[in-house]
Amino acid sequence: GASITASNTVTFTVDRFNSYGSAAAKYTVQQNAGSVTPPVGFTNYLGCTSSSAYSVGASDFFAVSQNIEGVNTADLSWGTASAKTVTLSFQAYSSLTGTFGGVIYNALFNRSFPFTYTISSANTWTSISIPIAGDTSGTWAGYAVGLTLSFSLGAGASVSGTAGAWVGAAALRAGLRGWSNACSLPRILRFAGAAPTILSRASKRLLTCLC
């Protein structure tokens, strides 16, 4: 597909994912960006490519995200004492090594779970698996957006937070830093097969990224 330039408004891109940047035109999103071989079991992937050098400010954030409908998340029972644990699994491929991040948050932007993952080898697909304890607080059910999964491509200090725990802060919807504090060429981050899975029923996936 064609390359889509991220703007400072939500722009739909590949396979239900959307892009956003607090500063426009700092990265592009494209199916099969860079034309690398997809991971085993996939024919395509979502690729994000840095477009220009940029120093990320304290309140800046850049991300690709997917909204998951409430009808697909209601049986997680999040927001109750019976909240179920899920595992977020995906394949990641980067021109850089290091720690990357993202976040899961609710439709009201007041419950967030920042997470990190590590890519130790550049330019190779890495399998990522992140357990996420169900949130016993907040509002999660509904027929519109149930939750949002967001992969950070860069985030400043005021919109970042400590990974691995639920927080009641809208500011953390940007997640962790992603591409560190400066976007510069050439930096490419690719994803395939992003899917939260309920641990107690591993066959159920809340979303599937076919990109």
PLM segments and residue spans:
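Extracellular and organelle-lumenal recognition/adhesion modules and their flexible linkers in secreted
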Residues: G1-C211
